[in-house]
Protein backbone atom coordinates (compact mmCIF):
# COMPACT_ATOMS: atom_id res chain seq x y z
CA UNK A 1 0.00 0.00 0.00
CA UNK A 2 1.26 3.49 -0.82
CA UNK A 3 0.48 6.88 0.63
CA UNK A 4 0.27 10.11 -1.35
CA UNK A 5 2.16 13.21 -0.26
CA UNK A 6 0.65 16.43 -1.59
CA UNK A 7 3.01 19.34 -2.10
CA UNK A 8 2.49 23.06 -2.40
CA UNK A 9 2.40 24.85 -5.74
CA UNK A 10 5.82 25.52 -7.19
CA UNK A 11 7.29 22.29 -5.86
CA UNK A 12 10.15 20.72 -7.79
CA UNK A 13 11.24 17.18 -6.99
CA UNK A 14 15.00 16.64 -7.23
CA UNK A 15 16.19 13.05 -7.41
CA UNK A 16 19.56 12.68 -5.70
CA UNK A 17 21.42 14.62 -2.99
CA UNK A 18 24.76 14.69 -4.73
CA UNK A 19 26.57 17.90 -5.73
CA UNK A 20 24.27 18.70 -8.65
CA UNK A 21 21.05 17.73 -6.88
CA UNK A 22 21.85 19.91 -3.86
CA UNK A 23 22.94 22.75 -6.14
CA UNK A 24 19.60 22.46 -7.92
CA UNK A 25 17.82 22.80 -4.58
CA UNK A 26 19.84 25.91 -3.71
CA UNK A 27 18.98 27.56 -7.04
CA UNK A 28 15.29 26.64 -6.72
CA UNK A 29 15.09 28.12 -3.22
CA UNK A 30 16.78 31.28 -4.45
CA UNK A 31 14.11 31.52 -7.15
CA UNK A 32 11.24 31.21 -4.68
CA UNK A 33 10.40 27.63 -5.62
CA UNK A 34 10.15 24.70 -3.22
CA UNK A 35 12.62 21.85 -3.75
CA UNK A 36 12.03 18.36 -2.41
CA UNK A 37 15.27 16.38 -2.64
CA UNK A 38 14.76 12.61 -2.60
CA UNK A 39 17.93 10.71 -1.71
CA UNK A 40 18.18 6.93 -1.43
CA UNK A 41 21.25 7.04 0.83
CA UNK A 42 21.47 8.01 4.47
CA UNK A 43 23.33 11.27 3.82
CA UNK A 44 24.43 13.67 1.08
CA UNK A 45 26.81 12.46 -1.59
CA UNK A 46 26.22 8.80 -0.76
CA UNK A 47 27.75 7.62 -4.04
CA UNK A 48 30.79 9.86 -3.59
CA UNK A 49 31.31 8.34 -0.16
CA UNK A 50 32.07 5.04 -1.87
CA UNK A 51 35.15 6.56 -3.48
CA UNK A 52 35.99 9.03 -0.73
CA UNK A 53 39.69 8.09 -0.84
CA UNK A 54 40.05 9.35 -4.42
CA UNK A 55 41.19 12.91 -5.09
CA UNK A 56 39.25 14.92 -7.65
CA UNK A 57 41.01 16.28 -10.74
CA UNK A 58 39.34 19.67 -10.45
CA UNK A 59 40.28 22.11 -7.65
CA UNK A 60 37.76 23.55 -5.22
CA UNK A 61 37.22 26.65 -7.38
CA UNK A 62 35.29 24.49 -9.86
CA UNK A 63 33.58 22.23 -7.31
CA UNK A 64 31.35 24.73 -5.46
CA UNK A 65 28.09 26.00 -6.94
CA UNK A 66 27.42 29.74 -6.82
CA UNK A 67 23.91 29.52 -5.31
CA UNK A 68 25.13 27.00 -2.75
CA UNK A 69 27.89 29.41 -1.78
CA UNK A 70 25.37 32.23 -1.38
CA UNK A 71 23.26 30.01 0.86
CA UNK A 72 26.19 28.86 3.01
CA UNK A 73 28.34 31.95 3.53
CA UNK A 74 25.83 34.04 5.54
CA UNK A 75 25.77 31.21 8.11
CA UNK A 76 29.54 31.44 8.62
CA UNK A 77 30.70 28.73 6.22
CA UNK A 78 34.17 29.32 4.79
CA UNK A 79 35.08 27.92 1.40
CA UNK A 80 38.20 25.71 1.21
CA UNK A 81 41.36 26.83 -0.58
CA UNK A 82 40.20 27.31 -4.20
CA UNK A 83 43.39 25.82 -5.65
CA UNK A 84 43.37 22.66 -3.55
CA UNK A 85 42.20 19.29 -4.90
CA UNK A 86 39.65 17.70 -2.55
CA UNK A 87 39.14 14.00 -2.00
CA UNK A 88 35.64 12.62 -2.32
CA UNK A 89 35.40 12.48 1.48
CA UNK A 90 36.46 16.13 1.77
CA UNK A 91 33.91 17.14 -0.85
CA UNK A 92 31.23 15.66 1.40
CA UNK A 93 32.55 16.85 4.77
CA UNK A 94 33.56 20.37 3.76
CA UNK A 95 30.82 21.21 1.28
CA UNK A 96 27.95 18.78 0.70
CA UNK A 97 27.18 18.06 4.36
CA UNK A 98 27.01 21.77 5.32
CA UNK A 99 24.91 22.45 2.22
CA UNK A 100 22.48 19.65 3.04
CA UNK A 101 22.15 20.96 6.61
CA UNK A 102 21.40 24.43 5.26
CA UNK A 103 18.67 22.97 3.04
CA UNK A 104 17.17 21.29 6.10
CA UNK A 105 13.75 19.72 5.65
CA UNK A 106 13.95 20.06 1.88
CA UNK A 107 16.15 16.93 1.81
CA UNK A 108 14.69 13.49 2.53
CA UNK A 109 17.09 10.59 3.07
CA UNK A 110 16.39 6.88 2.79
CA UNK A 111 13.94 7.61 -0.02
CA UNK A 112 14.56 5.70 -3.25
CA UNK A 113 12.64 6.82 -6.34
CA UNK A 114 11.45 3.76 -8.26
CA UNK A 115 9.30 5.44 -10.90
CA UNK A 116 8.23 8.80 -12.34
CA UNK A 117 5.03 9.50 -14.31
CA UNK A 118 2.57 12.25 -15.16
CA UNK A 119 -0.13 12.25 -12.49
CA UNK A 120 -2.92 9.78 -13.37
CA UNK A 121 -1.57 9.31 -16.91
CA UNK A 122 0.58 6.69 -18.54
CA UNK A 123 3.13 7.36 -21.27
CA UNK A 124 0.70 6.75 -24.14
CA UNK A 125 -1.93 9.28 -23.05
CA UNK A 126 -1.72 12.67 -24.74
CA UNK A 127 -5.08 14.26 -23.89
CA UNK A 128 -4.73 16.67 -20.93
CA UNK A 129 -1.04 15.78 -20.57
CA UNK A 130 0.36 19.30 -20.75
CA UNK A 131 0.37 21.02 -17.38
CA UNK A 132 -0.13 17.82 -15.41
CA UNK A 133 1.98 17.46 -12.27
CA UNK A 134 4.37 14.57 -11.82
CA UNK A 135 4.06 11.61 -9.50
CA UNK A 136 7.22 10.07 -8.07
CA UNK A 137 6.89 6.64 -6.50
CA UNK A 138 9.33 6.13 -3.64
CA UNK A 139 10.30 3.34 -1.26
CA UNK A 140 11.94 3.89 2.11
CA UNK A 141 14.50 1.73 3.90
CA UNK A 142 11.75 -0.38 5.45
CA UNK A 143 10.00 -1.04 2.15
CA UNK A 144 7.15 1.39 2.69
CA UNK A 145 5.86 2.98 -0.49
CA UNK A 146 4.97 6.65 -0.79
CA UNK A 147 3.98 8.73 -3.80
CA UNK A 148 5.18 12.34 -4.06
CA UNK A 149 3.50 14.87 -6.35
CA UNK A 150 5.50 17.76 -7.83
CA UNK A 151 5.10 20.35 -10.57
CA UNK A 152 8.48 19.57 -12.13
CA UNK A 153 11.26 17.01 -11.77
CA UNK A 154 15.05 17.22 -12.01
CA UNK A 155 16.66 13.79 -12.15
CA UNK A 156 20.17 14.27 -10.74
CA UNK A 157 20.51 10.70 -9.52
CA UNK A 158 23.85 10.10 -11.23
CA UNK A 159 25.07 6.80 -12.65
CA UNK A 160 26.98 5.22 -9.74
CA UNK A 161 25.87 1.64 -9.16
CA UNK A 162 25.04 1.09 -12.84
CA UNK A 163 28.39 -0.18 -14.11
CA UNK A 164 28.78 -1.45 -17.63
CA UNK A 165 29.25 -5.23 -17.62
CA UNK A 166 32.66 -6.84 -18.04
CA UNK A 167 31.52 -9.14 -20.82
CA UNK A 168 31.87 -8.51 -24.51
CA UNK A 169 28.94 -7.15 -26.56
CA UNK A 170 27.83 -4.86 -23.71
CA UNK A 171 26.31 -7.87 -21.93
CA UNK A 172 27.44 -9.69 -18.77
CA UNK A 173 29.85 -12.56 -19.32
CA UNK A 174 28.97 -16.04 -18.13
CA UNK A 175 29.69 -16.23 -14.41
CA UNK A 176 29.59 -12.45 -13.91
CA UNK A 177 27.31 -12.38 -10.90
CA UNK A 178 26.88 -9.37 -8.68
CA UNK A 179 28.53 -9.95 -5.34
CA UNK A 180 31.13 -12.42 -6.58
CA UNK A 181 33.97 -12.43 -4.00
CA UNK A 182 36.61 -11.75 -6.66
CA UNK A 183 34.75 -8.81 -8.17
CA UNK A 184 35.84 -5.43 -6.78
CA UNK A 185 34.13 -2.17 -7.59
CA UNK A 186 35.52 0.41 -10.01
CA UNK A 187 37.43 2.37 -7.32
CA UNK A 188 38.47 0.08 -4.45
CA UNK A 189 40.39 1.61 -1.54
CA UNK A 190 43.57 -0.28 -2.40
CA UNK A 191 45.85 1.40 0.15
CA UNK A 192 43.18 1.72 2.85
CA UNK A 193 40.36 -0.51 3.99
CA UNK A 194 40.71 -2.88 1.00
CA UNK A 195 44.49 -3.31 1.31
CA UNK A 196 44.36 -6.92 2.54
CA UNK A 197 42.17 -7.85 -0.40
CA UNK A 198 44.89 -6.92 -2.90
CA UNK A 199 48.16 -7.46 -1.01
CA UNK A 200 50.16 -10.29 -2.54
CA UNK A 201 47.36 -11.00 -5.02
CA UNK A 202 47.01 -11.04 -8.78
CA UNK A 203 44.66 -8.25 -9.81
CA UNK A 204 43.14 -7.62 -13.21
CA UNK A 205 41.91 -4.08 -13.87
CA UNK A 206 39.48 -3.81 -16.78
CA UNK A 207 38.68 -0.42 -18.28
CA UNK A 208 40.09 2.52 -20.19
CA UNK A 209 39.05 5.53 -18.14
CA UNK A 210 40.23 7.57 -15.19
CA UNK A 211 38.75 5.11 -12.67
CA UNK A 212 40.95 2.37 -14.10
CA UNK A 213 43.97 4.68 -14.15
CA UNK A 214 43.50 5.65 -10.49
CA UNK A 215 43.18 2.02 -9.40
CA UNK A 216 46.22 0.98 -11.43
CA UNK A 217 48.38 3.66 -9.83
CA UNK A 218 47.31 2.59 -6.34
CA UNK A 219 47.94 -1.08 -7.09
CA UNK A 220 51.40 -0.30 -8.46
CA UNK A 221 52.18 1.61 -5.27
CA UNK A 222 50.98 -1.35 -3.21
CA UNK A 223 53.16 -3.73 -5.24
CA UNK A 224 56.26 -1.74 -4.30
CA UNK A 225 55.92 -2.83 -0.66
CA UNK A 226 53.89 -6.05 -0.89
CA UNK A 227 55.73 -8.98 -2.54
CA UNK A 228 53.87 -11.09 -5.11
CA UNK A 229 51.37 -8.34 -5.86
CA UNK A 230 50.89 -8.29 -9.64
CA UNK A 231 48.88 -5.89 -11.75
CA UNK A 232 47.41 -6.61 -15.19
CA UNK A 233 45.49 -3.99 -17.13
CA UNK A 234 43.10 -5.05 -19.89
CA UNK A 235 41.47 -2.73 -22.42
CA UNK A 236 39.30 -3.40 -25.45
CA UNK A 237 41.12 -0.90 -27.61
CA UNK A 238 44.38 -1.54 -29.39
CA UNK A 239 46.38 1.17 -27.68
CA UNK A 240 46.13 3.12 -24.45
CA UNK A 241 46.99 6.58 -25.73
CA UNK A 242 43.54 7.95 -24.92
CA UNK A 243 43.93 6.87 -21.29
CA UNK A 244 47.39 8.41 -21.07
CA UNK A 245 45.70 11.67 -22.07
CA UNK A 246 47.22 14.97 -23.02
CA UNK A 247 49.92 15.11 -20.35
CA UNK A 248 51.19 18.66 -20.02
CA UNK A 249 48.49 19.84 -22.45
CA UNK A 250 45.74 18.89 -19.99
CA UNK A 251 44.08 21.92 -18.39
CA UNK A 252 43.80 19.93 -15.16
CA UNK A 253 47.40 19.07 -14.20
CA UNK A 254 46.31 16.30 -11.81
CA UNK A 255 44.45 14.56 -14.61
CA UNK A 256 47.36 14.91 -17.01
CA UNK A 257 49.82 13.62 -14.42
CA UNK A 258 47.81 10.44 -13.86
CA UNK A 259 48.10 9.49 -17.51
CA UNK A 260 51.81 10.29 -17.60
CA UNK A 261 52.50 8.19 -14.49
CA UNK A 262 50.46 5.28 -15.81
CA UNK A 263 52.31 5.28 -19.12
CA UNK A 264 55.62 5.11 -17.25
CA UNK A 265 54.40 2.14 -15.20
CA UNK A 266 53.39 0.26 -18.33
CA UNK A 267 56.69 1.00 -20.04
CA UNK A 268 58.64 -0.16 -16.97
CA UNK A 269 56.68 -3.42 -16.72
CA UNK A 270 55.19 -2.62 -13.31
CA UNK A 271 51.77 -2.81 -14.97
CA UNK A 272 51.20 -5.40 -17.70
CA UNK A 273 48.98 -4.01 -20.46
CA UNK A 274 46.82 -6.36 -22.53
CA UNK A 275 45.07 -4.81 -25.54
CA UNK A 276 42.20 -5.95 -27.73
CA UNK A 277 40.79 -7.75 -24.68
CA UNK A 278 37.23 -9.09 -24.58
CA UNK A 279 35.83 -11.33 -21.84
CA UNK A 280 33.64 -14.36 -22.58
CA UNK A 281 33.32 -16.10 -19.21
CA UNK A 282 34.47 -16.39 -15.60
CA UNK A 283 35.06 -19.66 -13.77
CA UNK A 284 35.53 -19.47 -10.01
CA UNK A 285 38.16 -21.79 -8.53
CA UNK A 286 37.98 -23.54 -5.16
CA UNK A 287 40.83 -21.44 -3.76
CA UNK A 288 38.89 -18.20 -4.32
CA UNK A 289 40.66 -17.20 -7.52
CA UNK A 290 38.92 -16.94 -10.89
CA UNK A 291 39.77 -18.02 -14.41
CA UNK A 292 39.02 -15.35 -17.00
CA UNK A 293 38.21 -16.79 -20.42
CA UNK A 294 38.85 -14.08 -22.97
CA UNK A 295 40.22 -13.12 -26.34
CA UNK A 296 43.06 -10.72 -27.01
CA UNK A 297 43.41 -9.48 -30.56
CA UNK A 298 41.10 -12.37 -31.52
CA UNK A 299 43.26 -15.06 -29.88
CA UNK A 300 41.75 -17.16 -27.07
CA UNK A 301 43.49 -16.72 -23.70
CA UNK A 302 42.83 -17.64 -20.09
CA UNK A 303 44.02 -15.56 -17.15
CA UNK A 304 44.14 -16.76 -13.56
CA UNK A 305 43.63 -13.87 -11.15
CA UNK A 306 42.54 -13.30 -7.56
CA UNK A 307 40.72 -9.99 -7.92
CA UNK A 308 39.10 -8.04 -10.75
CA UNK A 309 38.55 -4.28 -10.57
CA UNK A 310 35.76 -3.55 -13.02
CA UNK A 311 36.32 0.04 -14.14
CA UNK A 312 34.20 -0.35 -17.25
CA UNK A 313 32.27 2.90 -17.02
CA UNK A 314 28.62 3.51 -16.25
CA UNK A 315 25.25 3.74 -17.91
CA UNK A 316 22.18 5.70 -16.74
CA UNK A 317 19.27 4.00 -15.00
CA UNK A 318 16.39 4.76 -17.33
CA UNK A 319 14.00 2.14 -15.94
CA UNK A 320 12.45 4.57 -13.45
CA UNK A 321 11.69 6.94 -16.34
CA UNK A 322 9.81 4.50 -18.57
CA UNK A 323 6.54 6.48 -18.25
CA UNK A 324 8.19 9.79 -19.16
CA UNK A 325 8.39 10.99 -22.75
CA UNK A 326 12.11 11.49 -23.30
CA UNK A 327 14.19 12.73 -26.20
CA UNK A 328 17.39 10.73 -25.78
CA UNK A 329 20.19 10.00 -28.21
CA UNK A 330 20.27 6.39 -29.37
CA UNK A 331 24.05 6.12 -28.96
CA UNK A 332 24.98 7.65 -25.60
CA UNK A 333 21.52 7.85 -23.97
CA UNK A 334 21.95 11.56 -23.28
CA UNK A 335 19.52 14.36 -24.19
CA UNK A 336 19.53 14.47 -27.97
CA UNK A 337 20.69 18.08 -28.31
CA UNK A 338 23.91 17.64 -26.33
CA UNK A 339 24.73 14.06 -27.34
CA UNK A 340 26.71 14.91 -30.51
CA UNK A 341 28.97 17.14 -28.43
CA UNK A 342 29.95 14.45 -25.92
CA UNK A 343 29.84 11.16 -27.84
CA UNK A 344 33.02 9.32 -26.70
CA UNK A 345 33.43 7.71 -30.10
CA UNK A 346 34.54 11.04 -31.49
CA UNK A 347 35.01 13.39 -28.55
CA UNK A 348 37.44 13.16 -25.66
CA UNK A 349 38.71 16.69 -25.22
CA UNK A 350 36.81 17.43 -21.99
CA UNK A 351 35.07 20.56 -23.27
CA UNK A 352 31.53 21.15 -24.49
CA UNK A 353 29.68 24.23 -25.74
CA UNK A 354 27.76 25.75 -22.84
CA UNK A 355 24.25 24.36 -22.64
CA UNK A 356 21.25 24.89 -20.43
CA UNK A 357 17.55 24.26 -19.97
CA UNK A 358 16.62 24.52 -23.64
CA UNK A 359 19.12 21.80 -24.54
CA UNK A 360 18.06 19.52 -21.67
CA UNK A 361 14.28 19.75 -22.11
CA UNK A 362 12.21 16.70 -23.04
CA UNK A 363 8.79 16.29 -24.66
CA UNK A 364 7.27 16.08 -21.17
CA UNK A 365 7.54 19.73 -20.13
CA UNK A 366 9.09 20.34 -16.73
CA UNK A 367 11.12 17.13 -16.65
CA UNK A 368 14.93 17.28 -16.84
CA UNK A 369 17.91 14.99 -16.49
CA UNK A 370 20.89 16.91 -15.07
CA UNK A 371 24.37 16.22 -13.81
CA UNK A 372 26.45 13.25 -14.84
CA UNK A 373 23.31 11.31 -15.76
CA UNK A 374 22.63 13.90 -18.47
CA UNK A 375 25.82 12.71 -20.17
CA UNK A 376 24.40 9.18 -20.44
CA UNK A 377 27.26 6.83 -21.20
CA UNK A 378 29.73 9.60 -22.02
CA UNK A 379 32.57 10.01 -19.48
CA UNK A 380 33.74 13.63 -19.70
CA UNK A 381 31.38 15.36 -17.24
CA UNK A 382 32.57 18.13 -14.89
CA UNK A 383 30.73 19.35 -11.78
CA UNK A 384 30.75 22.94 -13.01
CA UNK A 385 28.82 21.86 -16.10
CA UNK A 386 26.12 20.32 -13.90
CA UNK A 387 25.91 23.45 -11.79
CA UNK A 388 25.29 25.54 -14.90
CA UNK A 389 22.64 23.09 -16.06
CA UNK A 390 20.58 23.38 -12.87
CA UNK A 391 21.05 27.16 -12.66
CA UNK A 392 19.48 27.45 -16.10
CA UNK A 393 16.73 24.93 -15.31
CA UNK A 394 15.77 26.74 -12.09
CA UNK A 395 15.60 30.05 -13.96
CA UNK A 396 13.33 28.53 -16.60
CA UNK A 397 11.03 26.96 -14.02
CA UNK A 398 10.76 30.36 -12.32
CA UNK A 399 9.77 31.96 -15.63
CA UNK A 400 13.02 33.87 -16.20
CA UNK A 401 13.71 32.94 -19.82
CA UNK A 402 16.47 35.51 -20.23
CA UNK A 403 18.47 34.07 -17.32
CA UNK A 404 17.80 30.52 -18.46
CA UNK A 405 19.32 31.26 -21.86
CA UNK A 406 22.28 33.22 -20.49
CA UNK A 407 25.65 31.46 -20.18
CA UNK A 408 27.16 31.71 -16.70
CA UNK A 409 29.47 28.69 -16.83
CA UNK A 410 32.63 29.51 -14.88
CA UNK A 411 35.10 27.50 -16.94
CA UNK A 412 37.77 28.58 -19.41
CA UNK A 413 36.61 29.14 -22.98
CA UNK A 414 38.84 26.76 -24.90
CA UNK A 415 37.66 27.34 -28.42
CA UNK A 416 36.49 24.48 -30.58
CA UNK A 417 36.75 20.85 -29.55
CA UNK A 418 36.63 18.71 -32.65
CA UNK A 419 33.80 16.20 -32.48
CA UNK A 420 33.01 14.31 -35.65
CA UNK A 421 29.31 14.04 -34.85
CA UNK A 422 29.11 17.74 -34.02
CA UNK A 423 30.95 18.65 -37.21
CA UNK A 424 28.73 16.37 -39.26
CA UNK A 425 25.65 17.94 -37.69
CA UNK A 426 26.82 21.37 -38.85
CA UNK A 427 27.68 20.17 -42.35
CA UNK A 428 31.42 20.75 -41.94
CA UNK A 429 32.53 17.24 -42.83
CA UNK A 430 30.21 17.11 -45.82
CA UNK A 431 31.42 20.47 -47.05
CA UNK A 432 35.02 19.45 -46.55
CA UNK A 433 34.59 16.16 -48.41
CA UNK A 434 32.46 17.45 -51.27
CA UNK A 435 33.95 20.85 -51.99
CA UNK A 436 37.42 19.80 -53.04
CA UNK A 437 40.32 22.21 -53.15
CA UNK A 438 38.40 24.88 -55.05
CA UNK A 439 34.92 24.12 -53.72
CA UNK A 440 32.50 26.74 -52.56
CA UNK A 441 33.36 27.96 -49.08
CA UNK A 442 30.73 27.99 -46.36
CA UNK A 443 29.16 31.41 -45.83
CA UNK A 444 31.10 33.46 -43.33
CA UNK A 445 28.04 34.02 -41.17
CA UNK A 446 27.71 30.29 -40.48
CA UNK A 447 30.17 29.39 -37.72
CA UNK A 448 31.70 25.94 -37.90
CA UNK A 449 31.01 25.15 -34.26
CA UNK A 450 30.24 26.93 -31.03
CA UNK A 451 33.04 27.88 -28.67
CA UNK A 452 33.48 25.20 -26.04
CA UNK A 453 34.02 25.64 -22.35
CA UNK A 454 35.70 23.20 -20.02
CA UNK A 455 39.02 21.90 -18.84
CA UNK A 456 40.61 20.43 -21.93
CA UNK A 457 42.21 17.00 -21.70
CA UNK A 458 44.66 17.74 -24.47
CA UNK A 459 43.23 14.82 -26.45
CA UNK A 460 41.16 15.86 -29.45
CA UNK A 461 39.71 12.61 -30.72
CA UNK A 462 37.66 9.81 -29.22
CA UNK A 463 37.43 6.06 -29.70
CA UNK A 464 37.33 6.43 -33.46
CA UNK A 465 40.97 7.42 -33.31
CA UNK A 466 40.54 10.13 -35.90
CA UNK A 467 41.73 13.68 -35.45
CA UNK A 468 39.15 15.87 -37.13
CA UNK A 469 40.84 19.02 -38.39
CA UNK A 470 38.63 22.05 -38.77
CA UNK A 471 38.54 23.64 -42.21
CA UNK A 472 40.87 26.62 -42.34
CA UNK A 473 41.02 29.52 -44.72
CA UNK A 474 43.75 29.02 -47.29
CA UNK A 475 45.95 31.76 -48.66
CA UNK A 476 46.85 31.00 -52.22
CA UNK A 477 46.79 27.25 -52.59
CA UNK A 478 45.75 25.52 -55.79
CA UNK A 479 43.25 28.24 -56.68
CA UNK A 480 45.82 31.04 -56.49
What is the meaning of each model-derived region?
Residues 4-5, 88, 155-225, 231, ...:
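Glycine-rich dinucleotide-binding loop and its adjacent helix/turn
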Residues 10-36, 212-222:
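N-terminal Rossmann-like FAD-binding beta1-loop-alpha1 element of flavoenzymes
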Residues 11, 34, 202, 227-230, ...:
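Residues at the starts of beta-strands that form the adenosine-phosphate
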Residues 20, 43, 160, 211, ...:
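Conserved Rossmann-like nucleotide-cofactor binding loop
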Residues 78-152, 156-161, 280-290, 304-307:
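Feature captures the FAD/FMN-dependent oxidoreductase FAD-binding
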Residues 115, 138, 220-330, 395, ...:
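A Rossmann-like FAD-binding core segment of flavoenzymes
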Residues 315, 330-480:
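C-terminal, flexible cofactor-proximal segment of oxidoreductases
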Amino acid sequence: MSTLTSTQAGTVAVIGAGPVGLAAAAHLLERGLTPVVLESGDGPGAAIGQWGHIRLFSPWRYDIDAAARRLLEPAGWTAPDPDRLPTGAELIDDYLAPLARALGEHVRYGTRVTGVARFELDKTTTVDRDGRPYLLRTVDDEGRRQDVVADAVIDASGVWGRSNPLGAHGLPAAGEEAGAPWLAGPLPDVLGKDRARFSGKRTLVVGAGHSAANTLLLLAELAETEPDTTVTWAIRGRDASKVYGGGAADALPARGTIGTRLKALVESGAVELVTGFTIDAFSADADGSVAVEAKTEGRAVELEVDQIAAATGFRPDLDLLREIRLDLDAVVEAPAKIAPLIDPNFHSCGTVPAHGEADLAHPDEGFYIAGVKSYGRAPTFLLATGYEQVRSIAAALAGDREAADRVELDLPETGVCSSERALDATGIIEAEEDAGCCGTAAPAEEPATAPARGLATGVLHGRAGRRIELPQAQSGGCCG
